[in-house]
Design a protein with these regions (language model features):
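The −1 position to Zn-ligating cysteines in a subset of zinc-ribbon hairpins
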Residues: 5, 19, 26-31, 41-44, ...
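Short Cys/His-rich Zn2+-coordinating modules
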Residues: 2-7, 58-72, 119-135
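Small Cys/His zinc-coordinating "RING-like" fingers
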Residues: 1-18, 75-102, 150-160
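Short linker/helix segments within small regulatory modules
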Residues: 16-24, 35-40, 98-107, 127-145
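Cys/His-coordinated zinc-finger cores
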Residues: 24-44, 107-125
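Cys/His-coordinated zinc-binding microdomains
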Residues: 10, 24, 33-36, 46-49, ...
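RING-type zinc-finger domain of E3 ubiquitin ligases
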Residues: 46-49, 111-157
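Short functional micro-motifs and their immediate structural scaffolds
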Residues: 11-15, 27-28, 33, 37, ...
């Protein structure tokens, strides 16, 4: 996702708009850049830079928000269940709860959004390492971002949104 609005005033940006040297946050002009720096950008600039610059940092924040919404929306349905990928109820690293956003029935289909994202990243990396692009085998792996590997139905609703932000 390319950020197309000034971080200070939200005005649309030209393609060659000025940027923060460290984190690449974009501004409509140097006045907005200086104003944004004084209003607190300097406190988060290093964090944005470490997070992969402005666009990746923004996508990561949106992913975290979307996962929180998805876990909350699925909370009643997922009580007492475990992730079919890592077999844990609460993810060991992210501490996130389970989601369910496909057509699986019974005890199948409960998963952590971060487990789905990690599985998809591994499959895509494997496909790229094996030079499968642009074959059907590559696209089968790419579909893991939006399709359940168990029921082969598309994820929907808040789960689709969370996994979509993960693939950024």
């Amino acid at each position: 996702m390319i950020l197309t609005n000034c971080a200070a005033c939200a005005a649309p940006l030209a393609h060659d708009a000025p940027r923060c040297v460290r984190c690449k946050t974009r501004y409509c002009n140097s006045t907005c850049q200086h104003d944004h720096w004084r209003r607190g950008h300097k406190q988060i600039c290093k964090k944005i830079h470490r997070g992969g610059n402005a666009e990746q940092y923004n996508a990561d924040q949106k992913y975290k928000e979307a996962v929180a919404v998805a876990v909350e929306a699925c909370a009643d349905d997922t009580k007492g269940q475990t992730c079919y990928i890592c077999t844990e109820a609460v993810h060991w690293k992210t501490k996130e709860g389970l989601v369910r956003g496909c057509a699986c029935r019974g005890a199948a289909g409960f998963v952590h959004a971060s487990c789905l994202a990690e599985q998809a990243k591994i499959l895509i990396a494997e496909a790229e390492d094996n030079n499968l692009y642009p074959t059907e085998r590559f696209y089968e792996r790419w579909r893991r971002w939006d399709t359940c590997s168990l029921c082969e139905q598309n994820y929907h609703g808040v789960v689709c949104c969370a996994v979509g932000w993960a693939c950024w």
